[in-house]
Amino acid sequence: LEFVLNKIRNYWGGMLDRGAVTFWEEFDPEAPVETQYDMYGDRFGKSLCHAWAASPIYFLAKYFMGLKFTGVGGKEFVVEPHTEFFDSFDCTLPVAEGQVHIVWDGNELKVEKTAHRLDL
């Protein structure tokens, strides 16, 4: 897990360090800032909001926040976060019929499920 977290911090964190607010289609931490948007032979050819670069979200939710679905359709789950990697975190993740909010303040872990109400 430490290798994965370091990769996320260095690679995707490198995008954030360069001003990204979404995940880019491709990123080379060694590339000069002047060429960071180059791709496909075009100076501004790179997509700056690309779904296939969003894998850290999956890794953080599953492996670090410890959200594991135990039943069909996401209605049953357990939360077993790896708090040892973080000073603190505040994470909200989707689950069936709602979301789960996981907060670690360095001392106390709080987990709360919120249901979406459907008024029909």
Name each model-derived stretch:
Residues 2-120:
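Non-catalytic C-terminal accessory modules of carbohydrate-active enzymes
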